[in-house]
């Protein structure tokens, strides 16, 4: 099924590509057909803030990780022009702003990974992944995700 038809079927809408918070490329092509998307935070009707295991629950964190992935996909679409060109989600790294005694970073990261699975299925949508607990993230956001995608060099 066409990725845009799949998104419509699932009720998934991409936001506008996120604004950058510094001097960097939002999405960088390298190695011929690989695109690295810089870290994206969640925006759900405005900014969200807090630390997992303190102000933010695992379930909220999963929603935020999904929102991060929507922003990643919006940045990727802006760079490549069409998500039908995506061949594979290769690798994602999810950073989770965590309280000292919080150890459920992988469960939080599942929110973003689940979206990729829903859109592209297991073979193309299940990436390798790291879920990393950190002390602080920019703007006090609870979750940030960066990703690497393999993209077809020919437009659909």
Regions found by a protein language model. Give the residues of each.
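Short, polar/acidic, helix-capping and beta-turn segments at strand->helix junctions
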Residues: 1-156
């Amino acid at each position: 099924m066409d990725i845009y038809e799949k998104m419509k079927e699932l009720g998934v809408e991409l936001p506008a590509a996120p604004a950058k918070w510094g001097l960097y490329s939002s999405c960088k092509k390298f190695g011929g057909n690989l695109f690295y998307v810089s870290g994206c935070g969640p925006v759900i009707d405005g900014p969200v803030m807090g630390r997992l295991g303190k102000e933010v629950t695992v379930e909220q964190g999963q929603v935020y990780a999904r929102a991060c992935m929507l922003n990643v996909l919006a940045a990727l679409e802006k760079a490549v022009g069409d998500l039908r060109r995506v061949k594979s989600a290769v690798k994602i790294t999810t950073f989770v702003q965590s309280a000292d005694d919080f150890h459920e970073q992988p469960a939080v990261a599942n929110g973003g990974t689940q979206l990729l699975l829903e859109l592209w299925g297991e073979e193309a949508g299940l990436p390798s992944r790291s879920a990393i607990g950190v002390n602080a993230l920019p703007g006090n956001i609870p979750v940030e995700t960066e990703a690497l995608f393999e993209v077809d060099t020919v437009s659909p």
